[in-house]
């Protein structure tokens, strides 16, 4: 299948919603490759905790944007957009269509919504100083510098608050003003999955992660990249590290990971509802509904 005009199909949804399996089924039917739009699966050695597609799954369909960067050299949104756009355009030249899959809403928006993030590298000294400030005070500071971003970023989301402040102090410009929109050179079809049993799916998948070796994977990351690796704050890895350090036990690590993942899923659903115009698929008939939408879109 090769459409007359390049087509990007974006399959989005909260974490643990079954996107990976559905994407593979869709890709097989329409003979497309898959681009994983995930802010963590792009890193080498972070497999179990990011629910990265397995080697068997990746052997069924070509997957791109997986295992691209070292955890010790994290990239920002601008870097990801540049890497991903090059890969997507190369794929579109060959096949005429491709499939994006992910739960990282901002990363998806950067690719299919024409978002143009600021090319401001992390400011290490400034970031270290900001991390010493209480979250409440950080958010108050952001309100003074960039009121619009302060409205959009949750007071507890210190990572995004610090990033917005970095951009302001490095450029003198508001993060919200820097993110201009530019036209994208392809057509986009947005599909979404949001199963009713999401919470039980999250619980089951989290338990599987720990059983498959999340603790051991975290230990390997610490041994390879150091105990202060920033990406160890990621959901799952953070709890595993706390358990390794003796701060919490196994049951507490599991419980906290499930709780944080449910909170993430809630934020993701809110983002997709407000920022995208997806056709939401019925979970029981997701594949036929997705294929029907794709064929209708292609005309």
UniProtKB/Swiss-Prot annotation:
Stretch list, region Interaction with substrate tRNA: 38-41
Cofactor(s) annotated in UniProt: Mg(2+)
Keyword Cytoplasm belongs to the record: no
Record field: catalytic activity: adenosine(37) in tRNA + dimethylallyl diphosphate = N(6)-dimethylallyladenosine(37) in tRNA + diphosphate
E.C. no: 2.5.1.75
Molecular function as annotated in GO: ATP binding; tRNA dimethylallyltransferase activity
Keyword annotations from UniProtKB, A to Z: ATP-binding, Magnesium, Nucleotide-binding, Transferase, tRNA processing
Keyword field contains Ion transport: no
Site annotation Interaction with substrate tRNA: residues: 104
Transmembrane regions listed in the UniProt entry: none
Binding site residues for ATP: 13-20
Function: Catalyzes the transfer of a dimethylallyl group onto the adenine at position 37 in tRNAs that read codons beginning with uridine, leading to the formation of N6-(dimethylallyl)adenosine (i(6)A).
Family: Belongs to the IPP transferase family.
Known partners and oligomeric status: Monomer.
Name of the protein: tRNA dimethylallyltransferase
